[in-house]
Amino acid sequence: MSESQNNSSDQHMDRYFFRAAAVDFKKIPGSPIGYWVSSRQFDCFEKYPQLSTFAVSSNGVQTGNNAKYVRLWSEVSASKVNIRWYPYNKGGQFRRWYGNFDFLVNWENDGESIKSERNFCARGEEFYFSKGITWSDITSGKLSGRILPEGFLFDASGPSAFFNDSSLTYIGLALLNTKFSDSWSKILNPTLHFQSGDFRKLTLAPSYISESTRLTAKALLKISKEDWDFYETSWDFTSLPLLHPDHRQSALKASYRRLRSHWHEMTEEMLRLEEENNRIFIDAYGLQDELTPEVPLNEITLTCNPHYRYGGDKTDDELEAMLLADTMRELVSYAVGCMFGRYSLDKPGLILANQGETLADYLAQVPQPRFPADDDNVIPLLDGDWFPDDITLRFRQFLRVAFGDAHYEDNLAFIEQALNVKSKRNYGLREYFLGEFYADHVKRYKKRPIYWLFSSPKGSFNALIYMHRYRPDTVSVVLKYLRDYREKLATEKERQAAVSINPASSQGEKTKAMREVDRLAKVLTELEDYERDVLYPLATEQVQIDLDDGVKVNYLKFGAALKKIAGLEAKDED
């Protein structure tokens, strides 16, 4: 082959291969292969000090038995937080700046019990409860750093770092959330993990340590925390955003528009600040020719941003419909919380959130509620207005109190239309409660529901209770509702039977009545079996629960009396 042919072949191959000098790889700690990296980026590792110079990172606590020692914060009594149960950072989904704070760990008496576990392991114990930064170990998407407030423990799923100079904490957080760090995380560890050792190998340019960087990070953190606390799954949740004075109007549609506008402004501001953070970084590291500051909208990690929350290839109209539907589901969930006394329209934050609390405890905190809590902790979900405290009736009352009477019908229609995502005919609030509501609740609370659904085999009888208000006689109260309901159905069956033989009834009326008689007979048989075989024996047991044991243990004590939750019996990962 001639020299010209060789040159031509080399040029052809250059189209498909990167060329890099082996000596450049040695500039990266651990010498990983990053063949696509430019020489200028290689120089960053040689020129600037590693984060190990400024911070210590650690994998924290390995409990050895998560099923025994770890809970979602909503599972236990609020009064035991920071006494027996302590905030526990376990990584979580792709989210930057603030959030993913869902768990508690049993660290009573300085972890006395947990430390006796054979597989227990403690790393970086001197940093427990200290302020730092954290990230999710598994990075199948993007690297995402978050602040770790004081008062937390953490595990290997949420490795954390603590700076020698606390003023660098926000600098480190800002650095971790740049495009550069995300790119380099894939080089330092090409697996789906970014571990504490990988963090220490990132570099920090002195010129990036500035008040501008710090203020940008704090502004981003503030927006992210506001977004996280919008939702009742945050322990700092106070009230529904729709009910905030800045957004609430008498017309729910107008309230939502105001809130949606606020969410859009938050998203746009975070986008601007994210790009500003990247710009500061690029200038500090001299990478103007290597990187651009732009951030795609689906990486603005706010739950109120539908492009992030839902992702995929959906149109803007589809995303908006999904966000509206979820916002209405959150309104319904908050209303149910007010029905049980977990929340109140008259006082922010949690009201009843400790085991065994009663209506008297509620009235001690909210003496004159505009919308009172249910008196017996049992709310029926049925196919009609059979009881005055039926969940559909109670929600309608809530809607009138929260938004007034002036636009009540329009407000109700707005909710029902938003919830009817499958465009079903004759779909209303009752259909939502009987259909999707409980599945939504179970999903919201990560298969550890705080409201439990007593449900007959075919769902003809349903009653909801709040586990924090559960008492050993609660099942007996549910049983009384069931028996009252059976009596009402039996009376209705007799009435329909009378219609079917009444000479004054038309043939169509008689046929319809006979069908209803047959249907009610089947329902009554179902309810008789449910009472005899399931509910009555359970009521006589006077079952005791302990919230410290968690939903998984307590829910399963009630067997077939409660709605089955798929996967609840699965083994927890340690």
Q: What are these model-predicted stretches?
A:
Residues S136-K201, Y208, T216-I223:
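Basic, amphipathic alpha-helical recognition segments used for DNA target recognition
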Residues S57, T63, A67-K68, W73-S74, ...:
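Extended interaction regions within the primary functional domain
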Residues M1-S116, C121-G132, S140, R214-G341, ...:
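Polynucleotide-recognition surfaces of large bacterial nucleic-acid defense/processing enzymes
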Residues E211:
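Catalytic palm subdomain of template-directed nucleic-acid polymerases
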